[in-house]
C-alpha cells in the first residue's frame, strides 16, 4: 500500500472514532510527520549511494566537456533526419 493511501486510511479511521475535530487534526498531523520522518531515513542511504555514482562518472564528464559543440550544432538537424529515415 502506498504511503499516501495509508495516511488517508488512517485519517478515515480517525474520523470515525474521533471525539472532536481537533483530535482528528492532531492524529492526521502525527501520522504525516511520522511518514515524513520514515521517508527521510530511507532517503539518507539513497543519497549516499548516488554520491559514489557521480564520482565514477567523472572521466566521462571530462570527455563530454571537451566536445566542441559550436562545430557540431549545424550537423544536428542532418543527424535527426537520417535517424528518422531508418
Swiss-Prot record:
Belongs to the arminin family. Residues 19-57 form a propeptide. It is found in: Secreted; Target cell membrane. Residues 1-18 form the signal peptide. Expressed in entodermal epithelium along the body column. Antimicrobial peptide with a broad-spectrum antimicrobial activity. Keeps its antibacterial activity under a wide range of salt concentrations that mimic physiological conditions of human blood, which is surprising, since Hydra is an obligate freshwater animal with nearly no salt tolerance. Does not affect red blood cells. It comes from Hydra viridissima. It comes from the Eukaryota. This is Arminin 7246. The modification Alanine amide is found at residue 83. One of its GO terms (cellular component) is extracellular region. Keywords: Amidation, Antibiotic, Antimicrobial, Immunity, Innate immunity, Membrane, Secreted, Signal, Target cell membrane, Target membrane. Its main location: secreted.
Amino acid at each position: 500500500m502506498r504511503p499516501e493511501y495509508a495516511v488517508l486510511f488512517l485519517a478515515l479511521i480517525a474520523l470515525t472514532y474521533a471525539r472532536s475535530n481537533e483530535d482528528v487534526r492532531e492524529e492526521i498531523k502525527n501520522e504525516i510527520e511520522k511518514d515524513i520522518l520514515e521517508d527521510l531515513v530511507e532517503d539518507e542511504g539513497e543519497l549516499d549511494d548516488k554520491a559514489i555514482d557521480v564520482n565514477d562518472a567523472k572521466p566521462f564528464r571530462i570527455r563530454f566537456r571537451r566536445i566542441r559543440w559550436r562545430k557540431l550544432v549545424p550537423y544536428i538537424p542532418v543527424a535527426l533526419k537520417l535517424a528518422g529515415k531508418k
